[in-house]
Amino acid sequence: MDPVMVQIGPLAIRWYGVLLTLAIFLGYELARRRLRAWGWDLEPFERVVFWAVVFGVVGARLGYVLTSPGYFLENPLEALYIWHGGLSFHGAILGGALTFYYFHRRRGYPLWPYLDAATPGVALGIVAGRIGNLMNGSDTVGRLTTLPIGFTWPEWARGFPGVCPGIDDISEVYRCAELLRGPVHLTQVYGAVVGLILLFLSLYWLRKRPFYGYAFWQFVLWYSVLRSVLEEPFRLNPLWLPVYRNDELGIGLFTATQVVSLPLVLLSLYMLRRLGKGEASRR
């Protein structure tokens, strides 16, 4: 709609950055409370979480750039402008998890308890990011559709380029001169719903917690499934495996995220089984 929350002279404070910052701080506090309730020392977590956030953001942006390379090859500096939106949450999870793993191997910090405790914060980040995408307008653009749920952007809405029908290359979206007036799938809202579902599920997994690592791998599993089913088919993303496309309904299969999600689902199932067996053998 309007990416700028507040304009103070030349300084523009954007919704995307404000919402993500709030999600990070709230997620951090939720993680601290969870670890304290489990009896873990908070000092090591507080030392590593800053770097986990930094490399989570780096991984998120890198993942987005690598899966939508056309535009960024021609405009490489745009890859640095994360306030314009465009973050891969698979990349964020990978970047953050690798940071925790590094400190686990290097300094002996706990791995699975930290990753488990961080899951509500990641879910909040998904919700915040998608609302920020909605305000940006140009992020996570939905496909044109004739379905009743199609949304037509109002004339006063700002912050988005046009979308041409039938495009599968995201770089073409940026080039299109037409204004986006829909009706389109409002995939920003679809993605926010995915984040809300994961937030409630992550809180349930943390309470259940049959073993450390359970909440984290359940999160990876269900994020991959829910994103692939509820959001990706309706987004105007390049089809890496063009198995199905319906321009009338606004559905396309399969995007890069959907392709990557399958091995992540299998890995999650394997790790849940492995960690569960390890816990059972210690009893």
Swiss-Prot record:
The chain crosses the membrane at residues 8-28, 48-68, 80-100, 108-128, 186-206, 210-230, 249-269. It holds the Pfam family LGT. One of its GO terms (cellular component) is plasma membrane. It is a multi-pass membrane protein. Its EC number is 2.5.1.145. The keyword Cell membrane applies. One of its GO terms (molecular function) is phosphatidylglycerol-prolipoprotein diacylglyceryl transferase activity. It is found in: Cell inner membrane. Keywords: Cell inner membrane, Cell membrane, Membrane, Transferase, Transmembrane, Transmembrane helix. A 1,2-diacyl-sn-glycero-3-phospho-(1'-sn-glycerol) binds at residue 130. Belongs to the Lgt family. Catalyzes the transfer of the diacylglyceryl group from phosphatidylglycerol to the sulfhydryl group of the N-terminal cysteine of a prolipoprotein, the first step in the formation of mature lipoproteins. This is Phosphatidylglycerol--prolipoprotein diacylglyceryl transferase. It comes from Thermus thermophilus (strain ATCC BAA-163 / DSM 7039 / HB27).
